Amino acid sequence: MDKLDLVNDGLDIIDFIQKNQKEIQKTYGRSSIQQPSTKDRTRAWEDFLQSTSGEHEQAEGGMPKNDGGTEGRNVEDLSSVTSSDGTIGQRVSNTRAWAEDPDDIQLDPMVTDVVYHDHGGECTGHGPSSSPERGWSYHMSGTHDGNVRAVPDTKVLPNAPKTTVPEEVREIDLIGLEDKFASAGLNPAAVPFVPKNQSTPTEEPPVIPEYYYGSGRRGDLSKSPPRGNVNLDSIKIYTSDDEDENQLEYEDEFAKSSSEVVIDTTPEDNDSINQEEVVGDPSDQGLEHPFPLGKFPEKEETPDVRRKDSLMQDSCKRGGVPKRLPMLSEEFECSGSDDPIIQELEREGSHPGGSLRLREPPQSSGNSRNQPDRQLKTGDAASPGGVQRPGTPMPKSRIMPIKKGAQTRSLNMLGRKTCLGRRVVQPGMFADYPPTKKARVLLRRMSN
């Protein structure tokens, strides 16, 4: 084939491409090796079998019919360049006479990059992933050196960007790849995973009461509470289950005393409380108690003071320590603090710190009578006090349930009765009513 035939073939190919630009798939400048059609391959295989069929036939005497000659072969049908016009054999290849047979033209050729281990297409230089920063090129390149890559990238594509990372850099300096990962579309602010030793549990810091109850200064009401939504999720639950050596003073008061809570009652709730349990000293109704919570001086008992709890009185007469149901981890007290809800209630004259009472356990049966139970008085002189035993149902108006994931609530929605006494939320129970004594005992046993 001379040069003139090659030029004519090139012109024919150019004319065909210009006429069929929409049907031909673009190869981005790379050569596509097209396979012959199925019809051409079938015909060539049949011709080969026919040409070689008489070659191995043997006669009865065991001698072959042909002594290895090629008379049975059809040399003209073989795929060899025999003519001078560029055709291959008698069949027309897909490189010549394009429009003769539609099977000869492969409109969607399969293009394969001649690159070893093309990770994310960083070595192609073409297409949407032409940039070497795309994909995982910095992370993946260079990790399969050795037995996998027979030919290095520098020999296959000498113009390819060198993105391999040395082994010592890969093992030691991983922080230096942050900028490269950021350009690859990853999260540059991601926190790296640091495996922790699970065999040695981390010791939690001791609980500070100010985190739960504020600073505890009940008299400091100069600061106005913030007018806005109060996120109830920020209120942490006071726990008293774990008894370590570094327990706090606030928790020790509950551990050594009867954790009973006295709530103020309004006249609408007086019907639900036994009148025998009503405590009242009319001379002290309007006084503010000058002593801290749970700490009282020694004082002789006046004859007109009534016992607020018959069980407490009987146990003290017998000389024993009164039975007490320990507080659950789901209970917490609304004592006086800098909490905006508590301060709002203190302004209204019904702050829960004045309605909460702790009893000191009697030292012996002798001085148990000389040390009566006392109650912190509130500014509301008209409201009598009532005993709220542990585990007894409370009025529904007294409870503000704290649900996990609860929405924020405005201060304007909170009434006078909200947050009085204790707020109880038990797991697995509805928050619209407090648990019974049986449920408290069962939950306490399960927690232990």
UniProtKB/Swiss-Prot annotation:
Residues 296-317 have a biased composition (Basic and acidic residues). The keyword Flavoprotein does not apply. Residues 26-104, 193-406 are annotated as: Disordered. Pfam families: Paramyxo_PNT (PF14320), Soyouz_module (PF14313). It comes from the Viruses. Residues 28-37, 77-96 have a biased composition (Polar residues). GO terms for biological process: amyloid fibril formation; response to leptomycin B. Residues 240-252 have a biased composition (Acidic residues). The modification Phosphoserine is found at residues 257, 350. GO terms for cellular component: host cell nucleus. Gene3D superfamilies: 6.10.250.2490. Keywords: Phosphoprotein. Disulfide bonds: none annotated. The P/V/C gene has two overlapping open reading frames. One encodes the P/V/W proteins and the other the C protein. This is Protein W. It comes from Hendra virus (isolate Horse/Autralia/Hendra/1994).
